[in-house]
Curated annotation (Swiss-Prot):
Subunit structure: Homodimer; disulfide-linked. Interacts with PXYLP1; the interaction increases the 2-phosphoxylose phosphatase activity of PXYLP1 during completion of linkage region formation in a B3GAT3-mediated manner.
Region described as Disordered: 312-335
PANTHER family the record matches: GALACTOSYLGALACTOSYLXYLOSYLPROTEIN 3-BETA-GLUCURONOSYLTRANSFERASE 3, GALACTOSYLGALACTOSYLXYLOSYLPROTEIN 3-BETA-GLUCURONOSYLTRANSFERASE BETA-1,3-GLUCURONYLTRANSFERASE
SUPFAM superfamilies, per database record: Nucleotide-diphospho-sugar transferases
Full protein name: Galactosylgalactosylxylosylprotein 3-beta-glucuronosyltransferase 3
Length: 335
């Protein structure tokens, strides 16, 4: 048994010696290992280069995006708003003023249907932060709505809009805010914004560069989902309307804007209080432009950016009952 173990050990030793000698011989042989090593080194170099490029990109300041024109370079939008005393007047004017505050380079011409300015409107304008001109003119009694008459029987806001046009033409009359009219050569656009409508601020971007008279659809008006111009090949070819489609300009007051230089060049252009029902807009526009020269806006008049909304008249039954009992709401609190 001892002999066999000795023989096994000897054989293991000889085999190990032979393996060691073979390994030593192989170490001395030429090895073709350089190409793989060079390839690996090149990959590492490329990765290092890419990392350096990414680090440089992170340190580089971002490109400056194209900037819109500075407010001073924009034509001024003159927004003319007639208003009259009623329970919802302040609520309407607050909503409108906060929409207008989002629009750069805007001048608000707010015209009260009153003999003189009221504290409510004066205070609201002062707090609005807007550039404004405060005007006031009373609607003649013959033109006023009578008790129980629907609003569409007589045109409203005629005297007030014309008062604002007079101010733009240098005839004065301001009772608050900016007193001086725009100097000759001023580039701007005039828009008639009633205090009860709803306006997207995008609308003002659309009208700002008006050259003559620009137009667009108005939502929720004339018994339709919208009224507005029909456009073909970039030109107005008709009007989508249901009531008296043969009017010279079947447009809503909120559906157009006029370049200021055009208005100033036509001193007789104004609204006619005696115009037939529904023709108030036409009474002004007929002095200014031919229908074929209207400038379609709002994606060729396919977008609605203004809505002819109406605030519901508040029901004051409980207030009246408390007033009869001498317990009405505090009149010193402005609503």
């Amino acid at each position: 048994m001892k002999l066999k173990l000795k023989n096994v050990f000897l054989a293991y030793f000889l085999v190990s010696i032979a393996g060691l000698l073979y390994a030593l011989v192989q170490l001395g042989q030429p090895c073709d290992c350089l190409p793989p090593l060079r390839a690996a080194a090149e990959q590492l170099r490329q990765k290092d280069l890419r990392i350096s490029q990414l680090q440089a990109d992170l340190r580089r300041p971002p490109p400056v995006p194209a900037q819109p024109p500075e407010p001073e370079a924009l034509p001024t939008i003159y927004v003319i708003t007639p208003t009259y005393a009623r329970l919802v007047q302040k609520a309407e004017l607050v909503r409108l003023s906060q929409t207008l505050s989002l629009v750069p380079r805007l001048h608000w011409l707010l015209v009260e249907d009153a003999e003189s300015p009221t504290p409510l409107v004066s205070g609201l304008l002062a707090a609005s932060g807007l550039l404004f001109t405060h005007l006031a003119v009373l609607t003649p009694k013959a033109q006023r709505l009578r008790e129980g008459e629907p609003g569409w029987v007589r045109p409203r806001g005629v005297e007030q809009r014309n008062k604002a046009l007079d101010w733009l033409r240098g005839k004065g009359g301001a009772v608050g805010g900016e007193k001086d009219p725009p100097p000759p050569g001023t580039q701007g656009v005039v828009y008639f914004a009633d205090d009860d409508n709803t306006y997207s601020r995008e609308l003002f971007k659309e009208m700002r560069w008006t050259r003559g008279v620009s137009v667009w659809p108005v939502g929720l008006v004339g018994g339709l989902r919208f009224e507005g111009p029909q456009v073909q090949d970039g030109r107005v070819v008709g009007f989508h309307t249901a009531w008296e489609p043969n009017r010279p300009f079947p447009l809503d007051m909120a559906g157009f804007a006029v370049a200021l230089p055009l208005l100033l060049a036509k001193p007789n252009a104004q609204f006619d209080a005696t115009a037939p029902r529904g023709h108030l807009e036409s009474s002004l526009l007929s002095h200014l432009v031919d229908p074929k020269d209207l400038e379609p806006r709002a994606a060729n008049c396919t977008q609605v950016l203004v809505w002819h909304t109406r605030t519901e008249k508040p029901k004051m039954k409980q207030e009246e009952q408390l007033q009869r009992q001498g317990q009405g709401s505090d009149p010193a609190i402005e609503v």
